């Protein structure tokens, strides 16, 4: 007895599900009539199609679904949708062929099918079992960019381009269809698994420090790689660019563009290698990540080369102590508080009962030498002529005489009891008495006082003594002129010190090297020069210099008759106890 629920005017299925699912035999119940009293012969009336009524039994199943003919090269094509030209294509292989010939034949058949679809415009499949359409996209003019016809046509064109590229590699003389236009550039998208690994920074690994990793991949593959999609651009940037704004709705991906398929495949391989390494290897062991950090430090100038660093724990090169893979050496971390050495404690110190040597004795010896040199003493010996020894530790290793006493720097005011060693320079008491043999830079400067001028002409140097000459009459003086300086005579006076005849010279206060004396007028005419005609001789005791015949005003040369030698008449002898200057001798 049928349930009352199964009988109705809606034409719903009244067959139990368990019976349809597990019973292999066809249902023996007759088909129920529809609301109009007609029966379509199928239980699933809502899936029925009028075209299925006239189809042979071999082209539909018991559920009313359409059957398709399977092809080798791609998506199935319904038989009723195939054109006559497509039905004539020979797909059966009737002769023996090699693998290369079979592959080339299949490529040729698929290429003819795609070309026929593109020529007729029949690119959209008619069956309803197709993928759902993506959200619509529009350009700046409001035209839709991803309609069904555009998407399927682009898909067929990309497939035909790949087939032709592959056929051209296999057959050098292969000819493409006449309507084929090779695209200038080929694009491919490689999606990044950001949703599966949200904690990994794929963008940073792909771009690298200042874009060097991305540039290296582009240089190796010859293709251009661009990162597009969500997360590729910071918020607020790129909104004005329509190309960037259109890609922001897609998932994060790498857009690879090149002019050949090989370059694109090489770039895709490099991108997949980076993604797989980041997803499978921990961050601390990722060589790509470490190389990028090292390269970034090199670009910033903060690189510290650890390859030449010596480990303080194991002594190997290439790592530091905190990264040492070997066991930690606790002995090297123990420092003795008594002697300052490493490797033992103060209880086991070998010099615990002795005065430990200073760690920096060389610096102390240099400092002592410097202080002794500044103090005027010797840096290599003490007062008794013995070599200077260290005051902190003796060479024999025994305790020094001062063992148990405070260190020298703590008892600066105490005197040293040992007579064989002098105290340190910093321990010497400050003495008010001046040293017996001070250093040149410690000697007091001489007082600056004006030299006392003696009024006795005999105490002056020879070159400052006045020449002995006879009394000069006021009538014998000539107008003042600059007298030249002659060696062996007195120094000339300034031009302003000459007085008119009969007027004594005033004293010259503060003249350097000149006494304050009222000296007589020096000769106005140098030796060897004749006075003008009519001028009396300034030195009556000496004969006048005869003039040379024929030349008025010229004197006779030395040695001529009537001439005299001035060098013989001058007294250049130095006073007793005074040596002559260089270049002069006593006559």
UniProtKB/Swiss-Prot annotation:
The keyword Protease does not apply. A zinc finger (CCHC-type) spans 309-326, 334-351. Residues 410-454 have a biased composition (Low complexity). SUPFAM superfamilies: Eukaryotic type KH-domain (KH-domain type I), Retrovirus zinc finger-like domains. It comes from the Eukaryota. GO terms for molecular function: mRNA binding; RNA binding; zinc ion binding. Residues 1-64, 121-142, 375-490, 551-587 are annotated as: Disordered. Residues 44-64 have a biased composition (Basic and acidic residues). It is found in: Cytoplasm; Nucleus. Residues 1-16, 379-399, 465-483, 563-573 have a biased composition (Polar residues). Keywords: Cytoplasm, Metal-binding, mRNA processing, mRNA splicing, Nucleus, Phosphoprotein, Repeat, RNA-binding, Spliceosome, Zinc, Zinc-finger. Residues 191-271 form the KH domain. GO terms for biological process: mRNA branch site recognition; mRNA cis splicing, via spliceosome; regulation of mRNA splicing, via spliceosome. Necessary for the splicing of pre-mRNA. The BPB1(SF1)-u2af59-u2af23 complex has a role in the recognition of the branch site (5'-UACUAAC-3'), the pyrimidine tract and the 3'-splice site at the 3'-end of introns. U2AF large subunit (u2af59), U2AF small subunit (u2af23) and bpb1 interact to form a complex required for complex A formation. Belongs to the BBP/SF1 family. This is Branchpoint-bridging protein. It comes from Schizosaccharomyces pombe (strain 972 / ATCC 24843) (Fission yeast). The gene is bpb1.
């Amino acid at each position: 007895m049928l349930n009352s629920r199964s009988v109705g005017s809606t034409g719903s299925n009244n067959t139990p599900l368990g019976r349809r699912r597990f019973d292999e035999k066809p249902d023996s119940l007759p088909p129920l009539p529809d609301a109009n009293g007609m029966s379509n012969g199928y239980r699933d009336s809502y899936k029925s199609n009028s075209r299925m009524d006239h189809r042979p039994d071999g082209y539909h199943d018991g559920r009313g679904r359409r059957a398709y003919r399977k092809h080798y090269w791609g998506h199935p094509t319904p038989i009723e949708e195939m054109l006559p030209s497509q039905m004539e294509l020979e797909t059966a292989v009737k002769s023996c062929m090699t693998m290369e010939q079979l592959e080339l034949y299949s490529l040729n058949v698929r290429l003819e099918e795609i070309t026929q679809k593109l020529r007729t415009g029949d690119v959209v499949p008619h069956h309803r079992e197709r993928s759902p359409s993506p959200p619509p996209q529009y350009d700046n003019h409001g035209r839709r960019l991803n309609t069904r016809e555009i998407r399927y046509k682009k898909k067929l064109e990309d497939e035909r381009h790949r087939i032709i590229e592959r056929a051209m590699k296999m057959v050098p003389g292969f000819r493409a269809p006449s309507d084929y236009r090779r695209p200038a550039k080929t694009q491919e998208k490689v999606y990044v698994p950001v949703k599966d690994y949200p904690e990994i920074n794929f963008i940073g690994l792909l771009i690298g420090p200042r874009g060097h990793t991305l540039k290296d991949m582009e240089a190796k593959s010859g293709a251009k790689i661009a990162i597009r999609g969500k997360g590729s651009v910071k918020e607020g940037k790129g909104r004005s660019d329509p190309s960037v704004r259109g890609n922001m709705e897609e998932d994060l991906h790498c857009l690879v563009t090149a002019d050949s398929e090989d370059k694109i495949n090489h770039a895709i391989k490099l991108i997949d290698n980076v993604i797989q390494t980041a997803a499978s290897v921990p961050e601390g062991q990722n060589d790509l990540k470490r190389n990028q950090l090292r390269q970034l430090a090199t670009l910033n100038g903060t690189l510290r080369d650890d390859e030449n660093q010596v480990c303080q724990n194991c002594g190997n090169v290439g790592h530091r102590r905190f990264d040492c893979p070997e066991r930690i050496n606790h002995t090297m971390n123990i420092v003795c508080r008594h002697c300052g050495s490493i490797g033992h404690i103060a209880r086991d110190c070998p010099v615990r009962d002795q005065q430990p040597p200073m760690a920096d004795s060389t610096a102390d010896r240099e400092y002592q030498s410097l202080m002794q040199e500044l103090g005027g003493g010797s840096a290599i010996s003490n007062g008794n002529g013995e070599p200077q020894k260290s005051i902190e530790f003796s060479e024999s290793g025994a305790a020094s005489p001062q063992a148990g006493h405070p260190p020298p720097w703590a008892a600066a005011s105490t005197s040293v009891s040992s007579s064989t060693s002098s105290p340190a320079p910093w321990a010497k008491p400050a003495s008010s008495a001046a040293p017996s043999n001070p250093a040149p830079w410690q000697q007091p400067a001489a007082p600056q006082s004006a030299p006392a001028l003696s009024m006795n002409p005999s105490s002056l140097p020879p070159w400052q003594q006045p020449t002995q000459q006879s009394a000069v009459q006021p009538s014998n003086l000539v107008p003042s002129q600059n007298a030249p300086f002659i060696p062996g005579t007195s120094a000339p006076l300034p031009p302003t010190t000459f007085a008119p005849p009969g007027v004594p010279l005033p004293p010259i206060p503060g003249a350097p090297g000149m006494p304050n004396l009222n000296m007589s007028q020096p000769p106005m005419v140098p030796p060897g020069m004749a006075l003008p005609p009519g001028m009396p001789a300034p030195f009556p005791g000496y004969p006048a210099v005869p003039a040379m015949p024929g030349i008025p005003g010229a004197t006779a040369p030395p040695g001529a008759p009537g001439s005299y030698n001035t060098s013989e008449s001058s007294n250049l002898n130095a006073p007793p106890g005074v040596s002559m200057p260089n270049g002069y001798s006593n006559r």
